[in-house]
């Protein structure tokens, strides 16, 4: 049964059929999906095997952002996802590196009007961890302290970029403009701090295989 929840997937520029397997897994295991928006860099990136149906809509970077010829990254494109015409208020953002491995229900993505956060736990070597890990470790400590989550001294949780349930209105309201690889993750943390998100539903159960 379809719902008022769309899926947005950003196709990676790497060659291969990851998008094909992602779509197959969605059609098999996420029965409630309304429309699927596939964002590709340009028309040359559209796979020749892809047959668009009524609920599969193709978009290019230029459809979302007029670049005037300059090179743009997918991090910028992510900021313009809420401008997609017809996109539902609740939607799920996917990377095409994800494969859904079992049947999913709406409540596993949106619970009590809150979007659930998929996180991954990583342990670090305190003698070898690098600058980025240092930032993520201390950010994770702060967020987990806000949420009442206890963590091991040398571990941190970071948001899995492969799958992020989102609300369109607060995303647009936040107005992220920074071209940074953590932008969309910071948006999810912003929602968590302001009471939109829920850490509890999917933290333990493994639904996806993320490369």
Where are these regions (language model features)?
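Short beta-strand-to-loop acidic/aromatic patch adjacent to the donor-nucleotide binding site
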Residues: 88-101
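Short beta-strand/loop segment that forms part of the nucleotide-sugar
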Residues: 33-43
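Short, acidic, metal-binding catalytic loop of nucleotide-sugar glycosyltransferases
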Residues: 25-33
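Conserved donor-nucleotide/metal-binding helix-loop-beta segment in metal-dependent transferases, i.e.
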Residues: 102-132
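Catalytic core and acceptor-binding pocket of nucleotide-sugar-dependent glycosyltransferases
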Residues: 129-211
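Short catalytic/ligand-binding loop motif for oxyanion handling, primarily in non-cytosolic enzymes
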Residues: 17-18, 44-49, 99-104, 108-110, ...
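Active-site-proximal specificity loops/subdomain of glycosyltransferases
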Residues: 41-87
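N-proximal low-complexity "stem/linker" segments adjacent to membrane-targeting elements
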Residues: 1-18
